[in-house]
Amino acid sequence: MSLGTAARMPSPKAPDYEKGKWAAAFAPREAGERRHWLVKSEPDVFSFDDLLAAPKQTTHWDGVRNHAARNFLKDGMRQGDRVFFYHSMANPQAIVGICEVVREGYPDPSADDPQWYAVDLRAVVRLARPVTLAEIKARPELADMALVRVGRLSVTPVTPAEWETIVAMGDRGPG
């Protein structure tokens, strides 16, 4: 097999989300339909506590420089969607809170190139108990979650079933 062929073949660990699971993130919506997402941040750069301390508990989510994640910001996230806030590069790595999209995708003001997008997020609630990556990986019903399958992305969709499972694991939070 040539290197070119190998590069085009889907990884057995990372299913073809563009044609499968991720396609739902871009599908037409019913009126009032709310979708769910996950964003990652290193807590020493910007934490959920920082979001809670921000004016109106709101911030612009900028600095994303990955095309797949940019597409979720630009074309997937809509006002009213709910978002898990995940602390990456932390000990432990965990989902710690829930946010809401309050402004849909717009050109990222921190970027020199207008191809990059940002959204505005507002804190909704801190989870009563953080849900760690280890706990997520231990749950068979979360095995296909984008966080587990393609953990490098800083913005990913979350299915309704994944959302409900994690909210229950965190003991608190609106749907």
Model-identified regions with their sequence ranges:
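Compositionally biased, charged N-terminal/linker segments
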Residues: 2-78, 173-175
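Short, acidic Gly/Pro/Ser/Thr-rich loop/turn segments
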Residues: 44-46, 128, 165
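Short, charged beta-turn/beta-strand-edge "cap" motif at the junction between a beta-strand
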Residues: 86-92
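Aromatic- and Lys/Arg-enriched surface recognition patch
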Residues: 94-155
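Charged phosphate-binding loop/patch that engages nucleotide di/tri-phosphates or the phosphate backbone
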Residues: 158-175
